[in-house]
């Protein structure tokens, strides 16, 4: 294999690797966006849950009716 052919082969490999790296980077960026949205949704669900627990916890503190 001549030196020129080896250089062409290496340049071709580098081009494919660059494309692969860019595709992987794009995927990581998209996954980061998804994770961020999921974190916001989980935080909202936790907030709702705590509000619901607070509403129901207050009802259990009332004294029983006099006939008990």
Swiss-Prot record:
**Cross-referenced PANTHER family:** PROTEIN SLYX (PTHR36508:SF1)
Q: Which residues form the signal peptide?
A: none
Q: What is this protein called?
A: Protein SlyX homolog
Q: Give the HAMAP family listed for this entry.
A: SlyX
Q: Which organism is it from?
A: Pseudomonas entomophila (strain L48)
To which protein family does this belong?
Belongs to the SlyX family.
InterPro entries associated with the record: SlyX
């Amino acid at each position: 294999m001549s030196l020129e052919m080896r250089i062409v082969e290496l340049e071709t490999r580098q081009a494919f690797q660059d494309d692969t790296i860019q595709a992987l980077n794009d995927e990581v960026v998209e996954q980061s966006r998804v994770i961020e949205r999921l974190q916001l949704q989980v935080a909202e669900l936790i907030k709702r849950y705590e509000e619901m627990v607070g509403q129901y916890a207050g009802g259990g503190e009332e004294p029983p009716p006099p006939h008990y």
